[in-house]
Amino acid sequence: MAAKPKLYYFNGRGRMESIRWLLAAAGVEFEEEFLETREQYEKMQKDGHLLFGQVPLVEIDGMMLTQTRAILSYLAAKYNLYGKDLKERVRIDMYADGTQDLMMMIAVAPFKTPKEKEESYDLILSRAKTRYFPVFEKILKDHGEAFLVGNQLSWADIQLLEAILMVEELSAPVLSDFPLLQAFKTRISNIPTIKKFLQPGSQRKPPPDGPYVEVVRTVLKF
């Protein structure tokens, strides 16, 4: 029996959360080792596991993988969440990159000053409602299918749901003008593996709080 993938990262969302989502949606069990001290981080660097000196790090299939985008692409292809051909794959890439841009705006906000954080959240909500969500509402309207690409679950769907839920944590009614996205959210959330991941007690991480921010600052020295 193959070993479970092992994820090395902080005990929080950051750049690892989309990886957790993808594995969970694929029904893949995984282990986690949480980065809590500077010494752990320096040992990982010394051991040569961090290609560019950065986490996340994922141990899978005899490999130590770094760089979030590369990890997500590998997992999507491995678990049949990456479309049926190159044309579907590039659309999945475009949609996933778009939602990743939105989610990274949210991920970095807790590390800002209170004033900057408030301004960031206002900008995030504005961008979500005027730049990102209208695009996905139109995609769903134009093809009339249940999923974003190829009428089957893909990385793009999983990451869009992740992004929607993150933005809803800032403003619960953010989807009020997007009925197709509301239906999409309900539909994808009810896929059994995803529904399980959304339940309390799963490996899904909560929004970043003060202690999480301090651990990241201490370990990475910024």
UniProtKB/Swiss-Prot annotation:
PROSITE patterns: GST_CTER, GST_NTER. Its EC number is 2.5.1.18. It is found in: Cytoplasm. The keyword Lyase does not apply. GO terms for molecular function: glutathione transferase activity. The gene is Gsta4. Keywords: Acetylation, Cytoplasm, Transferase. On the basis of immunological and kinetics data, GST 5.7 is distinct from alpha, mu and pI classes of GTS. However it has been postulated that this protein may be part of a distinct subgroup within this alpha class. The variations were found from AA sequencing and imply there are multiple forms of this protein. These variations are likely to be sex-linked and tissue specific. This is Glutathione S-transferase A4.
